[in-house]
Amino acid sequence: EARAEVREGARVAALLHDDRGRVAGVRWSGSDGVARDLRAPLVVGADGRRSLVARAVGAELPYRSSASGRACYFGYWEDPDESWREIAAQWREGPDLGTAFPCDDGLVLALVQPPVGRREAFREDLEGAYRATIAAIPPLAARLAGARLVGRVRSATGIESYFRRSSGPGWALAGDAGHFKDPVTAQGIRDALRYGRLLGEAAAAVLDDPVALDRATAAWERQRELDCLEVYQWTNVLARGEPMSPIEVELYRAAAAEPSLAGDLLDVFSRARRPSRVLSPPRAALLAARALLRPGARRDALQ
């Protein structure tokens, strides 16, 4: 058993510190509004992009960040098409990007990510602009044929990918609190689960030794950055809100004709392979040459 004690309906108001300034717990209150102190050798802020813990320890400002060129709008649809029940798919049409994820209870999540410059149209008519963007991505529109939108359309704008300082004396930031990537590559849940587990494994054996604990959380943070940096950079390219480059077009054409390359691309999404292994310099040069040989090719588009 994990021997975890769960306190539902609790709200953390502040961090506690010992006489050396080390984080030593949290001040929280329940539904009765009474403030209580809970002390711990390690406080983990797994409290999202607007992390209270990050603010309290002075780590809110990222040391590496990239503003997304896309906004995000999504809704859930009743999905009668059983043939897609276990298939997630993503399409790009001009500057637009659309994704469909199968969910529980016969639902499919349909997400569109148009360039941020179109936000005004969504402000004026959220559902209308959402449906219009789906219609502008024919494969996504075909995927949703016969499906029915249930509930309201939701939005996420002002998206910024980042790395925050994520460890210090008695504290650590897990999940989106410490590192966030644009949802275009759908990596957030994977990374939150993986590095949350690795943080627990790193800290468990040294909770009674503050010096060793701080070393362990610092090493965990370094490993997370080494593991995630390349995917972060790849995500930022896809999040620019621009049409595919000629090299990207050639890459997907090649993948359509070469099952092994298609598998390699899927491995990038599943993190079994690094993006640089798929789009290596020799392959990029070959794809660029193919793009230049296309009728009407523009050399400036390859710069």
Where are each of the predicted segments found?
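C-terminal helical "tail/cap" subdomain of flavin- and related membrane-associated enzymes
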Residues: 204-303
